[in-house]
Amino acid sequence: NDHMHPSDVKEGKIELIADCDGLLKVDREKLKKVNSLGEMMIATRHGDTYVKKGDKLAGTRIIPLVIKKEKMETAQAVCSDGPILTLKPFHKKKFAVLTTGNEVYYHRIEDTFTPVIQEKLAEFGAEMIFHEVYDDDASKITDGCRRAMEAGADLVFCTGGMSVDPDDKTPLAIKNTGARIVSYGAPVLPGAMFLLAYAENGTPIVG
């Protein structure tokens, strides 16, 4: 498929190599059908995973020394309407970080999370174009979200103020932008109060 190439045949095996960084998608139903034919196999990485250029995506081979032509044609027919593997290249995005909370705003604690976000998104070629610090004032945070999107941010991060304490205003601020909240809370630690919303223009806002 696009953005990948086969290796040379070695010991009866062919591997697929990624030509770019991206998200690997696997059609599990087609993979199961081919692997259920017998006398052949395809082993892949898990779908919906991040891969880098040069990574091995899959390995395939026939098990016996020879195989009937009809069986190979059946395997080809399974993929006649689309591939088993798809690699979706990453597109460089611009993002904004709104650091929220009285503790950071009044310099009681240091903002240590913004550098973490920058470092992680740099792996995907993303660029931070907007960064401001706010106290626990919902209206200011709401305005900051709007200005970040007006500045061209493809993704907005709001860090801090996400718990259930009375002075944590970030969820309300995100809601007041008019964004549609998809999820508030996730079964992960740290990150149990993770929030995902989409603004009216489709921009993701993450808290």
Regions found by a protein language model. Give the residues of each.
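Short, glycine/charged-enriched hinge/interface segments at domain edges or termini
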Residues: 1-129
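Short glycine/threonine-rich loop/turn motifs
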Residues: 102, 126-207
